[in-house]
UniProtKB/Swiss-Prot annotation:
This is Homoserine O-acetyltransferase FUB5. GO terms for biological process: homoserine metabolic process; methionine biosynthetic process. Induction: Expression is positively regulated by the secondary metabolism regulator LAE1. NCBIfam families: homoserO_Ac_trn, PRK00175.1.
Length: 463
C-alpha cells in the first residue's frame, strides 16, 4: 500500500461513523472511542507506522472497545457528574468536564449532613480503598448519619478531567495528554462545589482530608462557616514549601528524563514506565521516615524469598488497595530478591512497578504541579497568618512528629493562626504515611471532634 493510499484509508476510518478503531498516535493527534462504542466494522490491515517528511513516526493500533479513560476500570462503582463549562484560575475554559465521585449513606431531607472526604495525590474517589477502616456504621465516617462523598481531583487518572480523558468530553478531539491545562487546588474545590450543587447539597457538615486532601480541606473553609461547618486538615500545609516543591520537581524530572516520555506525547500502549517508577521511588522515601524503614528492613539482604511483613494492621478482606501512599499495610507479598542486595531495594522496586501499572505520567506531573500552586494567601492576604485567621470554622489539625514532608511545625502554624483550631498529634514513627495507616488513632480523634462540632448530627438516630 502506497503512502498516499495509507493516508486516505486512515482518513476514511477516522471519519466513517460505522467504523470504530482506537488510534495510538505518537504526534499531536489522538482519538479514543467513547464508552458506548463497539467495533462493528471490518478494519483493514494498516502498516504499523508511516513517516512524514520530518521523520515523525505515527503508530496505528486496532483494539477492542475501551472507555475514554483507560484507568476508569480501576475504580468500580464511581459515578460521573458533567459540568458543562468551567473556567480555571488560569482563565482557560474547559467544556463538558467530568467529575468522578463516590458516595455512601443518605442525604438528609435538609441536605445538610454532607461529609466531604478529600483524597491525597495518588488517590481516587473510593474512600474504602484507602480509609476503609474509618467508613461505616459507628465509625468516624458514619454512613448512618452522614452522606459521605469523595470527589476526584482534576488531573487524576481516576475519572475527573485529566490528561487521560477526552478533550472537552469529545473523543473526536483526542485525549488531553500533555495539553491538559494547569489546574490548582482552588480549581478542584470550585469544581467540586458545582458538583455538590448538582446533587442538591445545601450545607457541608465536615470536610476531612490529608496531604493534598488537607489542602483541599483548607480551601473548602473559605466558602464560609454557613456552608462548611467544620474542617479536619491532616498532615498538610497552608502553602507548598520550598522543600516539598523541590521533591516534586525531582520526581517530574525523573519522568521527563525517560526517553519514552516524548514531551508528554506518548501512547497508552508504550508509556514512560521507568521514569514514573523512579518518581514513585523518590516519593516513597518522603512518605516514610528513616526510623520506619530501618525498623522494617534494616540491612536485611534476603538471599532467598522472604515474605513482607504487615506492620500492625490489616485491610478489610475485600480491599484491593491501589491508592495508599506507600502501600505499607497491604496484604503480605513475597519479594524476589535474587536481583537485589537489600530488602529496602526490593520494597521500592515492587511498589514502583505496581504504581506504574495503575497511574499515568502526565497525570503525575499535572498533580505535582498542582501541589506547587497551593498558597492560601495568594490573592487574599499579604501573609499566610492573615489568610489562616480568616477561617472561622471549628478546626481539628492533625500532625505527625515524624513527618518529614509536611512537618509538625507546619501543622502547628495552622493551628496557631486559625482562631477556633486545636492541634492533635498522630503518634507514629512511620512518617507522613501515618495519616493513612494509624486508623484507630484517627477514628478516636475524629469521632471526638465531630461530637463536639456537630452534636445535632452525631446524636440523632440513623437516617
Amino acid at each position: 500500500m502506497s503512502r498516499r493510499q495509507t493516508l486516505k484509508t486512515l482518513q476514511k476510518l477516522i471519519l466513517a461513523p460505522s467504523q470504530h478503531i482506537s488510534l495510538s498516535i505518537a504526534s499531536n493527534l489522538s482519538v479514543i472511542p467513547s464508552r458506548s462504542m463497539t467495533t462493528t466494522a471490518t478494519v483493514p490491515v494498516l502498516p504499523t507506522s508511516i513517516h512524514d517528511g520530518l521523520g515523525k513516526g505515527i503508530a496505528y493500533e486496532k483494539s477492542l472497545p475501551r472507555p475514554v479513560n483507560p484507568f476508569s476500570h480501576r475504580v468500580p462503582g464511581r459515578e460521573i457528574i458533567t459540568i458543562p463549562k468551567f473556567t480555571l484560575e488560569s482563565g482557560v475554559e474547559m467544556r463538558n468536564v467530568p467529575v468522578a465521585y463516590m458516595s455512601w449513606g443518605k442525604l438528609s431531607s435538609k441536605a445538610n449532613n454532607v461529609m466531604i472526604i478529600c483524597h491525597a495525590l495518588s488517590g481516587s474517589a473510593d474512600v474504602s480503598d484507602w480509609w476503609g477502616p474509618l467508613l461505616g456504621h459507628g465509625k468516624a465516617f458514619d454512613t448512618d448519619k452522614f452522606f459521605v462523598i469523595c470527589m476526584n481531583s482534576l488531573g487524576s487518572p481516576y475519572g475527573t478531567a485529566s490528561p487521560v480523558t477526552a478533550k472537552n468530553g469529545d473523543y473526536s478531539e483526542g485525549w488531553y495528554g500533555a495539553d491538559f491545562p494547569s489546574t490548582t487546588i482552588r480549581d478542584d474545590v470550585r469544581l467540586h462545589k458545582l458538583a455538590l450543587d448538582k446533587l442538591g447539597v445545601r450545607k457541608v457538615a465536615a470536610a476531612i482530608g490529608g496531604s493534598m486532601g488537607g489542602m483541599h480541606v483548607l480551601e473548602w473553609a473559605f466558602f464560609g462557616k454557613d456552608y462548611v461547618r467544620c474542617i479536619v486538615p491532616a498532615a498538610t500545609s497552608s502553602h507548598q514549601s520550598a522543600w516539598a516543591i523541590g521533591w516534586g520537581e525531582a520526581q517530574r524530572h525523573a519522568i521527563r528524563s525517560d526517553v519514552k516520555y516524548k514531551n508528554g506525547r506518548y501512547g497508552f500502549d508504550d508509556p514512560p514506565v521507568l521514569g514514573l517508577e523512579a518518581a514513585r521511588m523518590t516519593a516513597l522515601l518522603t512518605y516514610r521516615s528513616r526510623d520506619s524503614l530501618e525498623r522494617r528492613f534494616g540491612r536485611d539482604t534476603g538471599s532467598k524469598k522472604k515474605t513482607q511483613k504487615q506492620e500492625s494492621k490489616t485491610l478489610p478482606s475485600n480491599s484491593t488497595p491501589i491508592h495508599s501512599h506507600s502501600g505499607a499495610d497491604e496484604t503480605p507479598v513475597a519479594f524476589d530478591r535474587a536481583d537485589s542486595s537489600f530488602a529496602a531495594q526490593s520494597y521500592l522496586r515492587y511498589q514502583a512497578k505496581k504504581f506504574s501499572n495503575r497511574f499515568d505520567s502526565n497525570c503525575y506531573i499535572a498533580l505535582t504541579n498542582k501541589l506547587d500552586t497551593h498558597d492560601l494567601a495568594r490573592g487574599r492576604t499579604r501573609t499566610i497568618t492573615e489568610a489562616l485567621s480568616l477561617i472561622e470554622q471549628p478546626t481539628l489539625v492533625l500532625g505527625i512528629r515524624s513527618d518529614g514532608l509536611y512537618t509538625l511545625a507546619e501543622q502547628e502554624q495552622i493551628a496557631r493562626a486559625v482562631p477556633n483550631a486545636k492541634l492533635r498529634e498522630i503518634v507514629s514513627d512511620d512518617g507522613h504515611d501515618a495519616f493513612l495507616i494509624e486508623w484507630s488513632q484517627l477514628n478516636w480523634l475524629l469521632i471526638g471532634f465531630l461530637h463536639e462540632s456537630l452534636p445535632d448530627i452525631m446524636q440523632r438516630a440513623a437516617l
